[in-house]
A protein has these predicted regions:
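Bacterial N-terminal signal peptides that target proteins for export
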Residues: 1-7
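Bacterial N-terminal signal peptides
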Residues: 8-16
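Predominantly soluble domains enriched in secretory-pathway, periplasmic, or organellar proteins
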Residues: 20-534
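Histidine- and aromatic-enriched segments that form or immediately flank copper-ligand environments
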Residues: 147-148, 570-604, 624-631
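Beta-strand-rich interaction surfaces with strong enrichment in secreted/lumenal proteins
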Residues: 318-319, 385-386, 556-559, 591-596, ...
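Extracytoplasmic entry segments of secretory-pathway proteins
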Residues: 515-545, 639-651
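Extracellular/periplasmic metallocenter environments
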Residues: 533, 597-651
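N-terminal edge beta-strand
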Residues: 536-566
Length: 651
């Protein structure tokens, strides 16, 4: 009977989507002139907020301005980017190195901005990769990926990457439970044999560098999303779960049988105590840690061999389970840290837990059994309240700092505003269509900036001019400064956004670097003056020490290269001015171009396969004589005796 109900719900969702505005979009009067004025940013003026929006299957992180919705930059993180040579040049290839080898693609999901005292501080953005479990740190000085750490004992790194209120930890859960350690076992033996690991990655407060501190071994549920405690609940982390049935097939039905799943409350302060007491097991685990240096402009890749593991079933006080209806997706903590909102995708109401009640229930041992040795708290003992009949298919909740919560509803395609404490719905606005995540700048912190809300929709249909079968994902901007939400803007996004993080521009923009100081360039092949340019042969390897400046390369004529050589072009941009990058591309190179920022050195490899004279040129327009910024390489037969030489202006 229940299986039929689930199938009916899925069918209803499908019919809802198919019926969306079949006659096409009616644009007349869709946005009032006042709304257009609110998103207009005059030429030469700045947006008031940054938005960092994940790319999902693009693997990247996009930077937008609010309220204009203008795209400023796509930061390559987990996928190669030929425009910026990320993953192609010799300096960044190892950023995509994993224990599985070089992986040129990733699935980026949940960005989170670093925090100090529970307030976003604008230094770094952390973002998770779902497919090959990893966490990346993006520098908001350079808007480049500074670090990627792989997560062992994990599969489907979804309940990530959220930071504690002083960025002590960035946390990574696992969507899929797997055998830990991995071994050959029948999938049908899932129950009781598959486990999950919740990873706590320590962050250096000065450099931002990450280190996997410990993992908490958990029952074989699916861990969907997570958020940190804050304020009064600082020191705890909360994870939503589904598939507490431990099903291994047809999960849309078999993982939807229990009336309640769990929100797991993890006491990471207690975990630190257990680590100090030595109550952990060191488990073999191979994972790769990649760090990019702004001094050497290169990546250092390290393979780690072990991890400290705490077994939640054997360590009292480490984890408690709070029953939550029904397949909760979002697990969101309000700015005070008192309320934990569980968005049960298949529930007719929304459950809100109380942190204070949870502590009291623990103290009074108000348990309703256990799961694999972990206490289950009584549902009524932690319940703060329920939001009744808010909508269909609740997913995610953010907060405005004024006592209001905002939740997305996928099936009924809307954002719903409700009051904390009274649990009453006070406003709702449609989205177009089937909204997933939402973001309020600072809405995942102790200090939300409750001016704007961005809804990230999963279905676009007729919102934009058609572009063939694949349609861009739609985002919508709402003004939430008043009592009622107001739709201001539709804007397209890159990939499939799963979450976003935002902050006022004043918090972020001061960190941005204008150029790299040439005297601080410690790249081993840096050439800081045209007097030092040269070409060096080492067997079949040839190293070209090259410079670029408006409007020429030095050297720009090279001879003595032979078929079968491996030629490394190490190009240093000598400019010391803002917004003067140089590019370079070589005919026949089986890599991307380079795009080199002022003061930076980058390298591409060219392996000539034909005799001849082959040109290279600057790919980034830099001056009135940009077209003249070019050169030639002469390639001779393998057995030739042409002398290796190089020149600029025949000198």
């Amino acid at each position: 009977m229940y299986k039929n109900a689930v199938m009916a719900l899925v069918l209803f969702a499908g019919l809802t989507l198919v019926s969306c505005n079949q006659g096409g979009s009616n644009n007349g009067g869709a946005l009032k002139s006042s709304a257009a004025e609110k998103v207009f940013v005059a030429p030469g003026e700045y947006d008031s907020h940054y938005a960092f929006i994940s790319g999902g299957f693009s693997g990247q992180l996009s930077v937008y301005g609010l309220p204009s919705g203008r795209l400023f930059k796509v930061i390559p993180v987990f996928s190669v980017d030929a425009e910026k040579a990320y993953g192609f040049n010799e300096e960044t290839r190892d950023m995509l190195k994993t224990s599985h080898g070089y992986i040129p693609w990733g699935d980026s999901h949940h960005p989170d901005i670093s925090q100090t005292n529970g307030v976003v501080d604008g230094r770094w953005v952390f973002i998770n990769e779902n497919n090959t479990p990893r966490i990346a740190r993006v520098s908001l000085e350079t808007y480049e990926t500074a670090e990627i750490i792989e997560i062992p004992n994990s599969a489907g790194n979804h309940s990530s990457s959220f930071v504690t209120e002083n960025t002590e930890y960035v946390v990574a859960g696992t969507r899929f439970s797997v055998p830990i350690p991995q071994r050959d076992i029948s999938i049908k033996d899932y129950k009781g044999n598959f486990k999950a690991a919740l990873s706590f990655i320590k962050v250096d407060p000065e450099s931002g560098n990450m280190d996997l501190d410990f993992q908490v071994l958990m029952p074989g549920f699916d861990y969907d999303l997570s958020h940190p405690g804050r304020g009064k609940s600082h020191g705890w982390f909360f994870f939503s779960t589904y598939n507490t049935e431990e099903a291994h097939t047809l999960l849309e039905v078999n993982a939807s049988q229990n009336d309640k799943d769990f929100i797991a409350a993890v006491n990471w302060k207690k975990a630190q105590e257990y680590i100090k007491q030595g109550k952990f097991k060191t488990m073999p685990a191979k994972y790769v840690h990649n760090v990019y240096s702004d001094e050497t402009h290169s990546t250092i890749s390290t393979t780690k061999k072990s991890v400290r593991v705490l077994d939640a079933s054997k360590l009292p006080g480490l984890v408690y389970l709070m029953p939550t209806p029904k397949s909760p997706h979002g697990c969101d903590v309000d700015p005070s840290g008192e309320y934990i909102v569980g968005s049960g995708k298949l529930s007719a109401s929304m459950t809100v837990h109380s942190f204070s009640k949870m502590l009291k229930a623990i103290e009074n041992k108000e348990f309703d059994g256990e799961a694999y040795g972990i206490p289950i708290l009584k549902f009524e003992s932690t319940l703060a309240g329920t939001v009744e009949q808010p909508g269909l298919g609740p997913l995610h909740t953010e907060f405005d700092g004024k006592g209001n919560a905002y939740t997305t509803f996928f099936i009924s395609s809307e954002v719903v505003k409700w009051k904390l404490g009274t649990w009453e719905v006070v406003d709702r606005k449609p989205t177009y269509y089937s909204v997933g995540h939402l973001m309020i700048p600072g809405g995942n912190s102790r200090k939300p900036f409750g001016k704007y809300l961005v809804a990230m929709n999963k279905i676009t249909k007729d919102r934009y001019l058609p572009t063939g079968p694949e349609v861009t994902q739609s985002a919508q901007l709402y003004d939430i400064s008043g009592e009622k939400m107001e739709l201001l803007l539709d804007f397209p996004t890159v990939g499939e956004p799963h979450y976003a993080a935002g902050a006022p521009a004043e918090v972020v923009k001061g960190f941005s670097k204008k150029f790299f100081k040439l005297e601080e360039n410690k790249h081993p092949y840096a050439t800081k003056s045209e007097d030092d340019v040269r070409v060096v042969r080492d067997g079949k390897n040839v190293h070209v020490y090259m410079t670029a400046i408006r409007s020429h390369f030095a050297p720009d004529n090279i001879e003595g290269i032979k078929v079968g050589d491996r030629v490394y072009f190490h190009v240093t941009n000598l400019e010391q001015d803002y917004d003067v990058p140089h590019g370079i591309s070589m005919i026949g190179a089986n890599t991307s171009e380079l795009l080199i920022m002022p003061g930076q050195t980058e390298t591409f490899v060219w392996e000539p396969k034909q005799v001849g004279v082959w040109p290279f040129y600057c790919t980034d327009f830099c001056s009135a004589l940009h077209q003249e910024m070019q050169g030639y390489v002469r390639v001779s037969p393998r057995n030739s005796n042409v002398k290796l030489s190089w020149s600029l202006d025949d000198e």
